[in-house]
Amino acid sequence: MNLIEQLARELNLKAHNVEATVKLIDEGNTIPFIARYRKEVTGGMDDVALRTLDERLSYLRNLEQRKEDVIALIGAQGKLTPELETQIREAEQLQRVEDLYKPFRKKRLTRAQKAREAGLEPLANMIIMQASAKGSALDAAAAYISEGTGFDTPEAALAGACDIVVETVAEDPECVADLRAFTHNTADIVVEATNADEATPYEPYYNYNEPLRKIPNHRVLAIDRGEREGKLRVRVNVNANEATARLGARWPRRHGVFAPVLDSAIADGYKRLMAPSLEREARAKLTVRAQTEAINVFAKNLEGLLSARPVRGARVLALDPGYRTGCKIAVMDETGKLLDHGVVYPTKPRGDVAGTKRELARLVKKDRVNTIVIGNGTASRETEEVVSEFIAEQAPDLRYTIVNEAGASVYSASELASQEYPDLDVTVRGAMSLGRRLQDPLAELVKIPPQSIGVGQYQHDLDQAELARTLGYVVEDVVNRVGVNVNTASASLLSYVSGITSTVAKNIVAYREENGAFTDRRELKKVPKLGPKAYLNAAGFLRIAGGKNPLDATSVHPESYPVATEVLKRAGVSASELERGGIPDIEKRAGSVAELAGQLDCGILTLIDIIDELKKPGRDPRDDAPEVVFSRSALSIDDLEPGMELKGTVRNVVDFGAFVDIGVHQDGLVHISKLANRFVKHPSDVVRVGDTVNVWVEKVDRDRKKISLTMVQGK
């Protein structure tokens, strides 16, 4: 089966779609471009399906290359048989290829190799095949004594032959595969404390065991961390007797003089060579599985955060709370432009509540503020109380919300922030970042490394390269799904646009600063290093509002302008209608999609996208996201009682549940069992970061500041 057929079978796709899609990928087209503008080619695959195909394609190509390498390496040793070559070529996993190659891999001089060099392989074969022999095994071994090699007695010769048998058994691909599956299916992970008297976060695992195949991913990561910190001792417990028996069953038994020798070699092979290797491999697989799931959860959480609904028209006063250094203030207009900044000291040690309220009143009036944003970090609760009092006393129409501070300090001290606002202090930049997260979460959060946004689980324990790669894909997909205003976007935002590198993004910003705003998508071709391929991949995602061609403000790709223009013509409307909100009934006016597609020589899926865009040009998919929850009065944990119904916002999703912000400065946990009145495989199947949910208080532990919530009424 060739690669295309295999991909089609595995992913349940049509072979011709797979072949054409692979060609597009190989030509250097991006996943967002292929997903959005080549639907006829792909059969309508979305970006998730395309990334799955791309990753599997890469794996299979690496697999094929490794097969060729292994065949060549074994062939160079003169040990490649037709049967072995067939086994290698038919292998469906890299692990199987490595198992087949293991007996031929060059390694340090082992006991078995020394024995082979001394001519003891024939004796080893006699043991393996249980050959008939006169007398005892030692009598047979006497014929293989070799002076000056260390095998100069029957006992030494027999021991050397056994070393060959041990290595042969331990490296047999079928034996390894069988014992690997046995270990996975039957072994337990056993955890003990290195110091049972020490209080640590890992106490639940001080005397813990669980089947390897059942242990949840979050426990794997917790145990791994405890082991790294020296608090836990971990081992894999396998029934060695049963494992040895399974191994022995794969070799011939004739009850001759070599039977006990073979039994001993098999037991030694498992205990000394196979068990440690398989147990390490089992632990490594657990960790990879857990990390992969954690990265996927992080990715889903990040997507929810980036896809949060912008709060348009908000004139924002952002407060970055603090104690000794005070609360930093940044006031911004609807576009995010800084109007004012300063510091107030409502909290200890100064406790200047009256002065803070006076300054808030002054700024709210002067800058026509309608929304206050408060960071959720240090001193947030005390700051919220002051803001709540101020609203009740002086500004009843004002509203406020709490935003996550994660990553704000990373951005404010970054080179990017110093380039954007060279004359502002880092504290002001941090407060501005909080306010802009409300106005346009996507545009602001792309300035921060995704790993620093804080919506993951055990994120610092994960494979950082894989985490960065996966999260980068998420940012890229969301940015291109939303689209970017090429005349206002930062270089950070532009760098995630399909086909645009960080260098080209900076060149776009430099070009518009030097030449003024872009008025036509074709002008992009004048940007240094933005070549034809980059233009093809990027143009549809870069929007120009108020330009020469109204289609430039839409997601219609320039290559489809002739089709879009003809659709408008048949509908009897001008492109200028797009600037007035679109043409909701264009489909009725222009005729049926099927007929138009045939007449205009355009694919149906592409035509549907064009018509949808003409109905509502430049539509922002984030407008479908839940609205931000605003408050006018503060709530504390002391106000909570079991049974109380509240509206909250999902802040984080983990393997065992979801953390929900209910406005008391301590997120409550909805355990996975309380997310729905049915079985839930993973919390992300029910909620995602940014969702607004109704919850009921189940239990409040005020001393430990823990809140248990449920999303199932009456549960």
Predicted feature residues:
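Low-complexity, acidic/Ser/Thr- and charged residue-rich accessory regions of DNA metabolism proteins
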Residues: 140-157, 207-211, 225-228, 235, ...
